[in-house]
Amino acid sequence: MANPQTLLALILTAAAPLAAAAHETDETHPQAAYTDLDYETPGYTLNINSNNPVVQQMQPTFKFGGYIMEKYSYSDRSGQTTNGGFDTRFVRLYMDGKVYQDFYYKLQMEVNGQPGVDKGPRIVDAFVEWQKYDCFRVKLGQFKRSFGFENPYSPLNVGLGSYSQATMKIASISDRIGEHKSSGRDVGVQVQGDLFPAADGHKWLHYQIGFFNGQGINHTDIDHHKDLIGGLWFSPLKNLAIGGFGWNGKYTNEAYNPNNPNSMRSAKRVRWGAGLKYEDKWTVRGEYMSSVGGVVSNATLPDRSDAWYLTLGVPVAKDVKVYGRYDCYRDAKTWNSLIANYGLSGNYYLGKNLIFQLNYTFTDNRSARRAAVPTDSRYNTIDVQVTARF
């Protein structure tokens, strides 16, 4: 561990002159610059210029960025307390960079929302990854669970106004099991890598496997079980991936009430999924996911569910891309519990830092139609989203 004099030298040299790099100036289609779609924004890069030997050895880099996503929505579903309104969907700030060339770090915060337990400003990403070898990288901290193709995507790159129901309910953006909002993330360690380079430079095979607490973000482990999550996919062509994912885990109910017969102490998360993605100027993305495990807040709810979706994105002009999605979720893994969303979205990119999005969704909710007290089951939703990033 560094002595106090070395730490002081690092602090002082970090305050030395910083050079801010401008945004990238790639003039290709706005999304073409972001091949790693869990990356948030181009950001601003700061490089430390110092004669201190410790700093020269570390070669630290810092990048700062963030985005604001505002939304207005309207729904014609009857019987609801509101038909829509304005919403600040995301305000996120991040810092990332490298030290010693091979160690990548990232800290990301979500700073919108009303303060409260698991609400309001909070850390969403906080990890370090050793990246010396493409074939073997090790990540430690709080980050996205390695389940599903869509889960790692930034909200900026999904293409529609929301994630699919499969990603929301089963890949744990907003997990059906009753976990607090964790945005598809957990605390743990993951090993991943890319193997067998092709002639065009892309790798034929990707693997990832991780051990996680199973309690979501910003929560410590409270049981003796660790979640095992992994994925494996094959890339026969550049930008095309075909593969599958598995999850063997358990969630322990932190709000368990022994006096409530419907409250469960824990629920297992045994899940698998398979799908494909193609990301370039055109987008094709589809997955099927299946889950075994109940809902900790209500033991009477089904313990088996599944979901699937198909997304197609078509560039219609240099700065305009249109997406369509067929999106299904069955909470009881029966056709009577099917919720089907048919979505259409237009994305306009004004430069690299402004995104205007118009989304339309028609929902056919069989579970609402067949409930003991039926509610409106066929309805339309329109929303407009504007994102500014830096």
Region roles according to the model:
Residues T88-F90, P121-D125, D186-G188, H225-G231, ...:
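Transmembrane beta-barrel architecture of outer membranes
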Residues Y348, F362, D376-F390:
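Outer-membrane beta-barrel "beta-signal"
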Residues G313-P315, D319-N353, Q357, T361:
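Outer membrane beta-barrel transmembrane domains
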Residues A2-M69, F390:
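N-terminal periplasmic/intermembrane-space "pro-region" immediately following the signal or transit peptide
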Residues P42, Q57, W233-A332:
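Detector for outer-membrane/organellar transmembrane beta-barrel domains
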Residues K71-S78, E110-G116, F147, A198, ...:
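Sequence/structural signature of outer-membrane beta-barrel proteins
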Residues N51-G214, I222-I229, W233-I242, T311-V314, ...:
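Outer membrane beta-barrel
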